[in-house]
Regions:
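Short gly/ser-rich loop at a beta-strand->alpha-helix junction or flexible surface loop bordering the NTP-binding
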Residues: 1-158, 269-272
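Surface segments flanking catalytic/ligand-binding clefts of nucleic-acid enzymes
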Residues: 141-272
């Protein structure tokens, strides 16, 4: 994610609408503006991925745009570019690039502005599939980046499977790992709640059927002494109240789901 959600890339015409030619030429000489390609300029603080997208003639799209806005996405390192249906990409650059292009039509206030959040989510669904869509959707809802109108917009443009995921989504999950676990356990018929406040333990990541606690540690390091001690205290407090706890890190949930699932199912068979 970029430090600033602004794009700071403009066509020369857009720049000239608010500044004189002399002012702009001075900014270019000072390095405050740099030429990306003919007629397109970026601020020296512009997001590197957005600059690369603009060099192709488009904007950030799909998961790249979502990540730029702070929306949780599954690991996908490819650059996604929104070229719109009416854009002409730069063929000399595009042929040599492994970027993923999105050609869906849509309006934006500025030439290189991001797609709307509903459109970003729709691109993710069509490009990356249901799980990637679901974790991004719940993250966008958690961040307040999409409301009822936006959800309705996406619903009208997805198939039955997409609409089902929208209906199942909520705004409670604090990370994509929580969303992913909840989605993958859906078929078991358990009640899986995210961000559950628990006496003496603060807020828990997930709780299954009001008994089994699931903690999903993200990429941040939880191995230092203070984190380890805090986790042990939380687990002991939960056990004191008759609850079991399972902990999984990012790599386990993403790359070893079979083990995670078997552990959860095995523990649930021991439920009192």
């Amino acid at each position: 994610m970029c430090a600033d959600s602004s794009i700071d890339i403009w066509t020369w015409r857009e720049l000239r609408a608010s500044s004189t030619r002399r002012t702009l030429e001075t900014r270019v000489r000072r390095g405050e503006l740099r030429r990306i390609r003919r007629g397109v300029y970026a601020a020296d603080t512009a997001c590197a991925s957005a600059v690369e997208a603009a060099a192709h003639g488009g904007s950030l799209g799909c998961e790249t745009a979502a990540r730029h806005l702070g929306i949780w996405v599954l690991d996908e390192l490819s650059l996604h570019i929104w070229l719109r249906a009416d854009r002409h990409h730069q063929p000399g650059i595009s042929r040599a690039c492994a970027c993923i292009r999105h050609w869906d039509a849509g309006a934006s206030a500025e030439t290189f502005a991001l797609p709307s959040v509903p459109r970003i989510l729709l691109q993710i669904y069509r490009c990356r599939g249901g799980e990637a869509f679901f974790v991004a959707l719940e993250s966008a809802r958690r961040l307040g980046l999409i409301g009822l109108d936006g959800l309705r917009w996406v619903r009208r443009r997805t198939d039955a499977a997409g609409r089902d995921l929208i209906d199942f989504s909520c705004a409670d999950a604090d990370s994509g790992l929580e969303s992913l676990v909840r989605l993958r356990l859906r078929g078991y018929g358990w009640t899986v709640r995210a961000q559950v406040r628990f006496i003496g333990s603060g807020v828990l990541d997930l709780m299954i059927d009001d008994w089994l606690i699931i903690e999903t540690d993200g990429k941040a390091n939880h191995d230092d002494e203070s984190h380890r001690h805090r986790d042990l205290v939380r687990d002991a407090t939960a056990a004191m109240w008759g609850h079991a706890t399972l902990r999984f890190d990012y790599a386990m949930v993403i790359h070893d789901w079979e083990l995670v699932e078997r552990a959860i199912v095995g523990m649930m068979t021991l439920r009192p």
